[in-house]
Amino acid sequence: MSATLQPYLEAVRHTLQAALCLEQFSSQVVERHNKPEVEVQTSKELLMTPVVVARNKQERVLIEPSVNSVRISIAIKQSDEIEKILCHKFTRFMCQRADNFFVLRRKPLPGYDISFLITASHTEAMFKHKLVDFLLHFMQEIDKEISEMKLSLNARARVSAEEFLKRFN
C-alpha cells in the first residue's frame, strides 16, 4: 500500500462513519412514501453539505449525505488510455449487475466512475461498520484489479507481437 493511500482511505472511512448516521424519514410530499432524499432532493433542509475526499486530481470520492440516505460516488485513477478503457468496462460490468449489490447504483454521477446509494433501510439491515469496510475494500480491490488486468493485457500484447514478428524472420 502506498504512503498516500492509507491517509486517503482513513479520511474516507471517518467521513463515511459520520455520514452514515441515518434515520427513516417519510416523504413530506406523498403520504406513506420513504424515498432517498439525496436522490429526489425535494427539500434543501434535508440535504447536508456534500464532501469531496481527494487523493489527487483523478482519484476522489464524493459523499453526499441527507437525512435518510447517503450517495457515494467514486472516481477511479486512470493514468492512461488502457486504464480508462479497462475502468469503463469494469464499472459497466458492475453496474449491469447492480441488483446483486444492494447499495450499488445503476448509473454513476457525471464525472465519477461508480456510485453507491445507502439508505436508512440498508443501515438497519446491515452493520454500518461492515458497509464502510465493504466500500473501502472495494476501493482498494478495484485499483488492484485494473492494474492486474493492465499487466495481463500488456503481456498478451507482447506475446502476440512476438508471434507476429516471427513470420518476418
UniProtKB/Swiss-Prot annotation:
Database matches in Pfam families: ARPC4 (PF05856)
UniProt keywords, alphabetically: Actin-binding, Cytoplasm, Cytoskeleton
Knocked-out gene: effects: RNAi-mediated knockdown suppresses the memory retention defects of the msi-1 os1 loss of function mutant.
Top-rank taxon: Eukaryota
Residues in coiled coil: none
Subcellular localization(s) per the UniProt record: Cytoplasm, Cytoskeleton
One Gene Ontology biological process: actin filament polymerization
Entry GO MF terms: actin filament binding
GO cellular component: Arp2/3 protein complex; cytoplasm
Family: Belongs to the ARPC4 family.
Function: Functions as actin-binding component of the Arp2/3 complex which is involved in regulation of actin polymerization and together with an activating nucleation-promoting factor (NPF) mediates the formation of branched actin networks. Seems to contact the mother actin filament. Plays a role in time-dependent memory loss and the retention of conditioned behavior over time.
Oligomer status and interactors: Component of the Arp2/3 complex, at least composed of arx-1, arx-2, arx-4 and arx-6.
The protein's name: Probable actin-related protein 2/3 complex subunit 4
Lineage: Eukaryota, Metazoa, Ecdysozoa, Nematoda, Chromadorea
